[in-house]
Amino acid sequence: VDFCVIDPDTGFEQRYRLLGPDQGIWHGHIEGFSLGTHYGFRAQGPWDPDAGLFFNENKLLVDPYGRGLAGAVDIRPEVYAHQVDEDLYPVSYPLEPSTTDSAPFNAHSVVIDTSFRITPQPKVPLDETVIYELHVKGFTQNMSEVPPNLRGTYAGLAHPASVRYLKELGVTSVELLPIHAKSDEPFLVERGLTNYWGYSTLSFFSPEPSYASAAARARGPQAVIDEFRGMVSILHEAGIEVILDVVYNHTCESGDTGPTLSLRGLDSPLYYRRTDTYPSQIIDTTGCGNTLNTDNPQVISLILDSLRYWVASMGIDGFRFDLAATIGRFSTGFTPLHPLLIAMGADPLLRETKLIAEPWDVGLGGW
């Protein structure tokens, strides 16, 4: 595995080979990188799509734990690990590895400062909670009191007019439709459409940059994160909790022949649930092309670490879990005693938050 540092202005890339794997971990200590550094990973390994293996060092991969994100994914042939035509369909079977570099067309992970003091959480009792579900981009679009340059942004949601409106309604908690950094699905791109709702996660740690104000986006990922944290603090000051609608059941990498942006290129069989008989085939209990493999302890850790980060560093007060039945599944089916669900309830940080489940998925017994 290579740790790749990228100059965002020139595209020049410096690669550092990591050591390992030691007990499954690739590691290294690299000094001299400042806040704002752009980076990603490249992973080498066997090319064997029939076994679910899509290692291709030509593909720059987003850090699954990256806190900041610069740019957006450009869905085009270069971001596929296998060769595809202009319509993004495989040019051959068996799949052949792509030889083009994806770095100019994938988002970049960015080093950011995580130290930020957020106003303490309101801790509204459950029996007094009034939740208002909203989309950050849509909520303020028609609010004349919010400046046009702030409408549809984190800063717009924190504007006094927005806060006053929520307080007048008696709202105690806002539930934000997905704000994790996202990418559009290929079938939408083919039709000239975008994923407005955001149930297509690219990064479980980074807020979606397009929901920040133009001024924040121009200053970079740190400013985007600071705007989000500032929004949370202002809402907390008004006594309003912030709950996130989160999508830990699948990612934006789609199905068996989707793009390779992050997890697929790092270890697809580990991160995505597959069949034992046909490991080339991803099991889909989400209706979105793939399913995160919560059989695996590393996937459980990824989800728990993400949840803790949003509470401890971003001030979040609770979560609504999209297709929650999926994250409580083993390969044999759903169980309320799944280790991930038990860990959420036992975690000293998470158990103090509001945890809301969408209690179904499209898998066997998911209704």
Give the role of each language-model region.
Residues 342-345, 352-367:
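Polar, glycine-rich mid-to-C-terminal structural blocks
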Residues 131, 243, 320, 356:
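Generic enzyme active-site microenvironment
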Residues 135-315, 323-349:
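Substrate-binding/active-site clefts of carbohydrate-active enzymes
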Residues 1-219, 233:
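N-terminal structural segment of carbohydrate-active enzymes
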